[in-house]
Curated annotation (Swiss-Prot):
It comes from Hydrogenovibrio crunogenus (strain DSM 25203 / XCL-2). This is Large ribosomal subunit protein uL11. Part of the ribosomal stalk of the 50S ribosomal subunit. Interacts with L10 and the large rRNA to form the base of the stalk. L10 forms an elongated spine to which L12 dimers bind in a sequential fashion forming a multimeric L10(L12)X complex. The gene is rplK. GO terms for cellular component: cytosolic large ribosomal subunit. Keywords: Methylation, Ribonucleoprotein, Ribosomal protein, RNA-binding, rRNA-binding.
């Protein structure tokens, strides 16, 4: 008989740096999942990524307390802030511009995010990322 799904848990965990402290511990603990087993598996899977880059993860918990997880690509906003060299986006994006990103940087981010974006080709993905950049108060060049 197939395992019955008990819950889906969505978290953002720093790449290669999952530990039992919040938010990971409480979220997994309330479903009875072995927290250290998840932390070891997650850290092993994300060791090739840049350290401490937040990685969205969807954990599927089954009724026998086993689990599987899927890692996604880092959020576009984090990648854009890193590319522009800023700490945070603008509070008033249409008035205050806090940085600039080039077309090449947008293409690089779109390539990274392509698996998680709802786009058919790279050009459409670049437009999605450019829209995110504008809504953060970044100027888009090119």
């Amino acid at each position: 008989m197939a395992k019955k799904i008990e819950a889906y848990i969505k978290l953002q965990v720093p790449a290669g740096n999952a530990n039992p402290s919040p938010p990971v511990g409480p979220a997994l603990g309330q479903h009875g999942v072995n927290i250290m087993e998840f932390c070891k598996a997650f850290n092993a899977q994300t060791q090739s990524m840049e350290k401490n880059l937040p990685v969205p993860v969807v954990i599927t918990v089954f009724n026998d307390r086993s689990f599987t997880f899927i890692t996604k690509t880092p959020p576009a906003s984090v990648l854009l802030k890193k590319a522009a060299g800023i700490q945070k986006g603008s509070g008033v994006p249409n008035m205050d511009k806090v940085g600039t990103v080039t077309r090449a940087q947008l293409e690089e981010i779109a390539n990274t995010k392509m698996a998680d974006l709802n786009a058919n080709d790279l050009d459409a993905a670049v437009k999605i990322i450019a829209g995110s950049a504008r809504s953060m108060g970044l100027n888009v060049e090119g």
